[in-house]
Regions:
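Short, charge-rich amphipathic alpha-helices with coiled-coil/heptad character
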Residues: 7-40
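Amphipathic, heptad-repeat alpha-helical/coiled-coil signature enriched at exported N-termini
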Residues: 35, 39-42, 105-109
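Long amphipathic alpha-helical coiled-coil segments
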Residues: 46, 50-55, 95-138
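Extended alpha-helical coiled-coil "stalk/arm" regions
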Residues: 46-85
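Short, glycine/alanine-rich amphipathic alpha-helical segment
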Residues: 72-112
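Acidic, proline/serine/threonine- and glycine-rich low-complexity intrinsically disordered segments
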Residues: 140-142
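Conserved small/polar residues in nucleotide/adenosyl-binding loops
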Residues: 144-146
Length: 146
């Protein structure tokens, strides 16, 4: 599931038919369950990705310092680092420029954006009952004046 798919689903799910406000009201729980399930999945993926990032960062730190054993390098599928070992004050620059870490950080930021989108959708779903109630009241008032 990606952001565009979630947005597309919400475009369909957010539509409230004025002629079927009662049905829309009873559908709110189903719609909420759908998006809360997505939110939980995204949060779990985000937690896993953050843990992967921390482990990769630790291994990259050791890699650039030349502290990984031959077995660890083989297990990670990396060649030994052949350049000059960076000083401690240079290490952040090395890690920030590492493509593997950049890729994983990009994934984390994408998942955070998905979470932000889902939080917004869930907020709208919470407000939906209020909107439906107002719509029903408005229709009652309109009928009373006819």
């Amino acid at each position: 599931m990606n952001i565009e798919e979630i947005q597309s689903m919400w475009e369909q799910d957010s539509v409230i038919d004025d002629n079927h406000l009662g049905e829309a009201s009873t559908d709110t729980a189903k719609v909420h369950a759908k998006y809360i399930k997505l939110m939980v999945q995204v949060k779990l993926r985000l937690t896993k990705s953050r843990a992967e990032y921390n482990l990769l960062r630790k291994n990259k730190f050791k890699y650039y310092r030349g502290e990984l054993s031959r077995e660890e390098l083989v297990g990670l599928g990396w060649e030994p680092y052949q350049l000059i070992k960076p000083l401690k004050n240079e290490m952040d620059e090395f890690l920030q420029g590492d493509q593997d870490l950049i890729n994983l950080n990009t994934k984390i930021e994408y998942l955070e954006t998905m979470g932000y989108l889902l939080e917004g959708i869930l907020g709208q779903i919470k407000a939906r009952d209020w909107q439906l109630k107002n719509g029903i009241e408005w229709k009652k008032i309109g009928r009373a004046h006819v």
